């Protein structure tokens, strides 16, 4: 929740192909877009991924809600995105592994990944996630 990175996050999310790929729909008008991103950062655990001081990606842990729309304690949804010029370098795998290593025990992390997104599936597998059903994967922190 570092507001010092807000400008860098806004710049990262200016890449529409990136935001569309992860299902993040933001307002087109700049002022509304910045406010929406600010709200998103405030409501979730957002960690930026930096390379040589530049923000090249982000990892998000969000509260997980069950089928009835009720928040489930100790369950989180993992979301992540990385600038396309940084793909296939192990950067996101490393970032997620670092985050998982500092999480407390007895947490379940869910991730939604399109079945056609093989790169992202490989990241999840390398980070210990197991395929659940449909587009859902999960990892239990013991």
Give residue spans per PLM region.
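Short loop/turn motifs at secondary-structure junctions and domain boundaries
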Residues: 38-43
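Conserved GNAT-fold acetyl-CoA-binding loop/helix
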Residues: 17-37
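Acyl-donor (CoA/ACP) binding surface of acyl/acetyltransferases
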Residues: 1-19, 46-142
């Amino acid at each position: 929740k570092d507001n010092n990175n807000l400008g860098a996050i806004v710049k990262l999310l200016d890449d529409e192909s990136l935001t569309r790929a992860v299902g993040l729909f933001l307002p087109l008008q700049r002022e509304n877009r910045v406010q929406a991103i600010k709200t998103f950062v405030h409501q979730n655990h957002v960690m930026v991924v930096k390379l040589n001081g530049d923000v090249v990606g982000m990892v998000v842990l969000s509260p997980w809600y069950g089928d009835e729309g009720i928040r489930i304690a100790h369950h989180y949804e993992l979301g992540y995105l990385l600038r396309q010029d940084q793909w296939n370098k192990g950067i996101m795998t490393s970032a997620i592994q670092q985050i998982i290593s500092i999480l407390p025990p007895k947490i379940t992390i869910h991730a939604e990944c399109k079945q056609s997104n093989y790169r992202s599936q490989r990241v999840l597998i390398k980070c210990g996630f197991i395929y659940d059903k449909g587009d859902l994967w999960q990892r239990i922190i013991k």
